[in-house]
């Protein structure tokens, strides 16, 4: 009986130690400029960004363009996002706007592959972590505000 209790205690201790790691947190940043609303969500542990999502909404009329004109401009760019591990991009062309949902899983993506893609800015190199602190500084320089 003592052996069973001891084994259970060791398993519980191992489980608690495993769960006591840095908790994943999120921060959301937004920016609006003519015809475009951007919302970036960062998932991070400590200073390490593990995932980033971006929801971009583009209103055709605000840009003075039609749905077809915007589609013609965005489709070739979206093709560059395809087939890259850790990167997922979806465009939803609606009647009055297009909504882009972009996800970067930094635990799977190779940063060197992401750097050559239009619209993606990364300061880190392969093998390095994407820093939440540096990301925040860059976003603030670009006019993003944190959504609380």
Whereabouts are the PLM-identified features?
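Sec-dependent signal peptide recognition
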Residues: 3-10
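C-terminal motif of bacterial Sec signal peptides marking the signal peptidase cleavage site
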Residues: 15-18
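Subset-of-secretome marker
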Residues: 22-148
């Amino acid at each position: 009986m003592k052996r069973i209790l001891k084994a259970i205690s060791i398993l519980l201790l191992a489980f608690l130690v495993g769960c006591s790691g840095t908790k994943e947190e999120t921060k959301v940043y937004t920016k609006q400029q003519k015809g475009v609303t951007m919302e970036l969500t960062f998932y991070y542990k400590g200073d390490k960004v593990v995932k980033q999502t971006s929801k971009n909404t583009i209103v055709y009329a605000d840009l003075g363009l039609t749905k077809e004109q915007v589609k013609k401009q965005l489709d070739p760019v979206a093709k560059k996002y395809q087939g890259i591990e850790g990167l997922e991009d979806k465009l939803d062309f609606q009647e009055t706007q297009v909504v882009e949902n972009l996800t970067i899983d930094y635990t799977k993506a190779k940063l060197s592959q992401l750097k050559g893609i239009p619209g993606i800015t990364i300061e880190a190199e392969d093998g390095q972590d994407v820093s939440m602190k540096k990301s925040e500084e860059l976003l603030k320089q670009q006019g993003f505000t944190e959504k609380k």
